[in-house]
């Protein structure tokens, strides 16, 4: 769910806002797989992105496993988050983290992935840092840490199936009704 929403958000920033974007996956191989299976399919299946991709389906310097450069000049990078070198030399407006809980907490003793990645948006007029993941072990989970450090706390409210009153989703254990 989150990954598909993230692709929609990145597509919006590429087509409507002309913003350079950088998406981090936990590893280089995960980033390559993501580019092949998700990004290329999205570009192929979304008409406005396909129109910005004259290189689609062929070898071209603007069509690599780490970068998609669109005819509008906008760039989209997808890199692994395990190597410190991947957090350098990119100036973007949007940085995204997919499966943040699977990242190492310290990247080659240079800092956390979000600390290093968010440096890429420091010069942007409209900086965006987007983070998401399936939560893992409480107390050591990076998405939990990111949520706790966030200036914003949002909940998704749904109507109670019995009385209709709005309530937020709270997950419990087997004994929770």
Where are the regions a protein language model picked out?
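Phosphate/NTP-binding elements of NTP-utilizing enzymes
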Residues: 1-177
């Amino acid at each position: 769910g989150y990954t598909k929403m993230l692709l929609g958000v990145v597509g919006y920033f590429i087509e409507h806002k002309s913003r350079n974007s950088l998406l981090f996956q936990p590893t280089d191989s995960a980033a390559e797989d993501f580019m092949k299976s998700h990004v290329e399919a999205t570009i192929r299946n979304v008409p406005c992105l396909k129109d910005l991709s004259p290189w689609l389906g062929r070898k071209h310097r603007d069509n690599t496993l780490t970068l998609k450069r669109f005819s509008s000049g906008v760039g989209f990078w997808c890199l692994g988050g395990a190597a410190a070198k991947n957090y350098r030399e990119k100036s973007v407006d949007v940085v995204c983290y997919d499966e943040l809980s699977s990242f190492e907490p310290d990247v080659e003793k240079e800092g956390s992935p979000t600390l290093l990645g968010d440096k890429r948006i420091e010069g942007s007029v409209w900086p965006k840092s987007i983070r998401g993941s399936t939560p893992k072990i409480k107390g050591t989970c990076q998405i939990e840490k990111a949520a706790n450090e966030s200036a914003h706390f949002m909940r998704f409210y749904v109507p109670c199936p019995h009385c209709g009153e709005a309530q937020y989703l709270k997950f419990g254990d087997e004994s929770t009704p």
